[in-house]
Structure formats: C-alpha cells, structure tokens
Regions:
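Catalytic cores of alpha/beta
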Residues: 24-36, 108-115, 137-141, 160-162, ...
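Internal active-site segments that recognize and position negatively charged phosphoryl groups
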Residues: 87-131
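A generic, well-ordered mixed alpha/beta core segment in the N-terminal half of proteins
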Residues: 16-51
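Active-site-adjacent beta->alpha loops and helix N-cap segments on the catalytic face
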Residues: 1-5, 24-30, 50-87, 106-109, ...
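Short, well-ordered coil/turn segments that N-cap beta-strands
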Residues: 10-14, 39-41, 90-96, 122-123, ...
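Hydrophobic faces of well-ordered beta-strands that scaffold small-molecule active sites
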Residues: 14-18, 43-45, 96-100, 118, ...
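Active-site pocket-lining/capping segments in soluble small-molecule metabolic enzymes
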Residues: 48, 61-89, 99-104, 145-197
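Flavin-dependent oxidoreductase catalytic cores
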Residues: 1-13, 94, 184-188
Length: 205
C-alpha cells in the first residue's frame, strides 16, 4: 500500500520489497496479486531476516519458502497461473528483482546464487547497502557475465548507533573502520556526507 501511495500521490517510482518471513505461500501470492491490482509492478524478492535482532524478537517466523520460492511464485503469476495451476484473468507484469551481497565471504558462491536467481525469474539485482567501494567493484566484476541490471544499494547513516548495528547485526553489510570513526565523531551530518561521497563514487563504477 505504501508503494501504491508513493506512486499514485507523489509520482515516485517504487520497488515493493516482499520477504518470506511473515507469510505462507498463499499470503505471499495474495500480496503479489494485490500489488498487481494497484499497479505496483516492480518487486524485490527477499528471504528476510529472523526477528531475533529486531524490536519484536518474540515474533514467530514463517519461511515456508525462501527467496527462490518467492521468485517462482512471481514468475508463475507472470505466466498467468496461480500456485494451484488455475488461470488468472490476466497475467501479472512484474519486473522481478533479487538481492545481491557484495559483502559475501565467497563471491563465487554468490555468483552461483545469482545465476540460480536469474534462472528462477529475476530481471534485476539490488544489492545490500554499499559502504566499501572496493568491495562493490569486486562484486560488479564477478557478476559481469550476467545480462541484468545491478543496482548498488545505499542507505544514509543517521547515527553511530545505526552504523554499528548494521555492521555487527545485519548479514552482508560491512562498514569500513574509517566510516565507523567518522560516524562516531560526526553523527548524522557525517552520514549525509558519506552517502553523497559514496553516491558520487558509485557513479564511476
């Protein structure tokens, strides 16, 4: 609904993020059909993180499928079928995204994962937020064989607390010591500066 409101009221192109953590396959299918009905066609498929490190650590996860299963659900809907094999009134027209992890410890394994995601229906890749440009360059080079757009993620840091949380708690996000030091000294202002600097450097990759 937020994606729809931004597109409808603000004319901002959105990418609807959908994870497997909170819904079974019927719920995931329902979310996707609802998005299609609202004209939200760009989606990012994610497995999702367990709630352990969030503000609702007591919540139960679902994970009936992972991101590969969610990709297949979207691909099936695009082919005009639901999960039970019934014909839809019209096929959906999702532009399907998958995640990439430049911070993965083994980029060859990451390459194999991306190949499988593309085979399962991914049209584009959106990475975890980038805070290490050399890491991003290595990732782009490793994935150069794939003929799909790769969007490098960028999230401005608001505080040193946020920076340390991302660095220590979120898999695949690695901040350099230089960035951590700058955030400790400069807070939100430093985070804005880092985001602008990173964006300018990303444009050159």
């Amino acid at each position: 609904s937020l994606s729809y409101l931004l597109q409808h009221n603000k004319e901002i192109e959105t990418i609807f993020h959908l994870t497997c953590r909170d819904r079974n396959i019927i719920g995931l299918q329902s979310e996707l059909l609802g998005a299609a009905a609202l004209g939200v066609h760009s989606i990012l498929t994610l497995t999702g993180d367990k709630p352990d490190n969030g503000d609702h650590p007591f919540a139960q996860s679902v994970f009936e499928v992972d991101c590969m299963g969610l990709l297949n659900i979207a691909k099936t809907l695009n082919a005009g079928k639901d999960l039970a094999g019934n014909d839809l009134d019209a096929p959906t027209n999702f532009y399907i995204g998958a995640t990439g992890n430049p911070g993965a410890p083994d980029l060859e394994i990451e390459r194999q994962k991306l190949a499988a995601k593309i085979q399962n229906g991914a049209h584009f890749v959106q990475t975890q937020p980038i805070y290490d440009l050399e890491q991003a360059k290595r990732y782009i080079d490793k994935m150069s064989e794939f003929d799909v757009p790769i969007m490098l993620g960028l999230i401005p840091l608001k505080s040193f607390k946020m920076a340390t949380y991302l660095h220590e708690k979120v898999p695949g996000i690695n901040l350099t010591q230089e960035i951590l030091d700058r955030m400790e000294k400069g807070g939100k202002e430093a985070g804005t500066e880092i985001a602008i600097e990173t964006l300018e450097q990303i444009k050159k990759i």
